[in-house]
Design a protein with these regions (language model features):
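Enzyme catalytic cores with a strong preference for nitrogen-chemistry domains
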Residues: 1-204
Length: 204
């Protein structure tokens, strides 16, 4: 992240309230590196919030570590404000289908080696981020599924979608993914703020 505007002037960052980074923007576990978060927070414009895709992990009661693909919001001092854990994981990319069955028949090493992310709550809780209406978070291809991207009973005011489209390569994939996002915005009647890594970023 640059501490100056595109024309090289630092004061051009004045008035920026939210900085949004895509999925896979941080190559480390931010909650385990408070010094890095503090340094990033110091670069943010005063009073602004960083919203970013990031990974986190936690220990279960049994001592097992579980990893999550998450959307996080951080304040100006690097403090965590809000977290959403991806609920709709990518088969074989983020989890191994039937992993409990494979584990039960003695293939634990296979199940642990492929797709290590845990599933976030399907209730899709809203994020409370200063300066924004209640936000529904969507990570990557979660935005593709009509009728299931938000809980309408919770009445979000906007959707933030972070994605890493780098694995599509030089194909039509990033454009198709973006057009599907536009359709979701129309279906839900909500603005979508989209930050993409090697894809199309936009406010829809």
């Amino acid at each position: 992240m640059s501490a100056v505007g595109p024309d090289g002037k630092k004061d051009n960052l004045a008035g920026i309230t939210h900085v949004i980074w895509p999925e896979a923007a941080m190559p480390f576990l931010p909650l385990e590196h408070p010094d890095a978060l503090a340094a990033i927070g110091a670069m943010l414009p005063d009073g602004s919030v960083l919203v970013t895709g990031a990974l986190r992990r936690e220990k279960t009661a049994g001592g097992e570590r579980r990893g999550f693909n998450s959307l996080m919001a951080f304040g100006g001092k690097g403090q965590l404000i809000a977290t959403y854990d991806k609920a709709h994981l990518v088969p074989f990319g983020e989890y191994l289908p039937f992993n409990t069955v494979l584990g039960a028949i003695g293939l634990e090493k296979l199940t642990k080696g492929l797709g290590s992310f845990a599933t976030g709550p399907m209730s899709r809780p809203l994020l409370t981020i200063p300066g924004l209406p209640p936000v529904a978070g969507l990570i990557c291809y979660e935005v593709l599924f009509p009728g299931s991207v938000i809980d309408r009973k919770l009445k979000p005011g906007a959707i933030i979608n972070v994605t890493n489209d780098g694995w599509f390569g030089d194909t039509t994939g990033p454009r198709q993914h973006f057009h599907q996002t536009r359709v979701r915005a129309v279906e839900e009647g909500l603005p979508i703020i989209r930050a993409a890594n090697n894809g199309i970023s936009a406010v829809i």
